[in-house]
Regions:
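Short glycine-rich, Thr/Ser-proximal phosphate-binding strand/loop in the N-terminal lobe
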Residues: 5, 10-48, 96-103
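N-terminal start-of-chain detector that recognizes signal peptides
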Residues: 5, 50-52, 129
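Glycine-rich phosphate-binding/catalytic subdomain of phosphoryl-transfer
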Residues: 59-246
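N-terminal phosphate-binding loop and adjacent alpha-helix
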Residues: 30-71, 115, 121
Length: 246
């Protein structure tokens, strides 16, 4: 079991859980089909959609293991999550989602996209997380003052699984421009962003609320008891399994 790895991908129409062995060949899998919903002018998935979908895909994968090998899955060697990039999930200090998840499909940030592209001298597509954040600021949305964490779907799941507010550098490149010399956000652009919103007098700066950027092989946390309980409804999955950067 220590030589296995579990990969879970949250695509736009399907959530897939695949367990592989030491030779990287699939051992077992499970999936769950889902659809985004158009709600109040926003393409979204609810938190319930996310967790019931993840749990269903995991349960089917674990059942596949049981059926094929007569083993109750309690541990795997490692876990990795990936999900549709970009979009906007904003949370307060208590971990509450402040507004419904705004997915990559939304084209509601044109003003922010243009202004940030000019400010940074770097193309910022509408779907990027920072465009969503800046558009919420430009709109005067009251939730922005209460933000403690802004992340993507993969970043959210990693946080719930491990308690770590981290993403891999690939995921981060759809959040905010990445400096390939430092493998993190461009420091000068972060400073420009903070300066551009300084007149709002928020209690946070950009680096306070964005996920920390990791590269492949970096420690991205381990599965907590709470995370294991969220993923595996049977309660068989044990805590302590390492996760890679999402």
């Amino acid at each position: 079991e220590q030589k296995t790895a579990l990969g879970i991908e949250l695509g736009s129409t399907r959530i897939k859980a695949v367990l592989i062995g030491a030779d990287n060949a699939p051992i077992a899998s499970g999936d769950h089909e889902w659809e985004n919903r158009y709600d109040n002018g926003v393409w979204t998935y609810t938190l319930e959609d996310i967790w019931t979908g993840l749990q269903d895909a995991y349960t089917k994968m674990a059942a596949d293991v049981k059926e094929k090998y007569d083993i109750t899955l309690t541990r795997v060697g490692a876990i990795g999550f990936s999900a549709m990039m970009h979009g906007y999930m904003a949370f307060d200090k208590a971990g509450n989602l402040l507004v419904p998840f705004r997915t990559w499909r939304n084209n509601i940030t044109e003003e922010a996209s243009e202004k940030l592209t000019d400010l940074f001298g770097f193309h910022i597509p509408q779907r990027w997380t920072i465009a969503h954040l800046y558009q919420a600021i430009l709109n005067g949305e009251p939730h922005v003052a209460d933000i403690d964490y802004v992340t993507t779907l993969a970043g959210y799941i990693q946080w719930k699984m491990t308690g770590e507010r981290v993403v891999g550098v690939g995921e981060a490149s759809g959040i905010f421009p990445i400096d390939s010399e430092t493998n993190t956000y461009f420091a000068d652009m972060i400073a420009k962003f903070d300066e551009a919103v300084a007149d709002k007098a928020y209690s946070w700066k950009a680096l306070d609320v964005l996920p920390h950027v990791l590269t492949a092989g970096d420690n991205a946390g381990v599965l907590t008891k709470e995370g294991a309980a969220l993923l595996d409804m049977s309660g068989n999955l044990e805590a302590g399994i390492p996760l890679c950067p999402p």
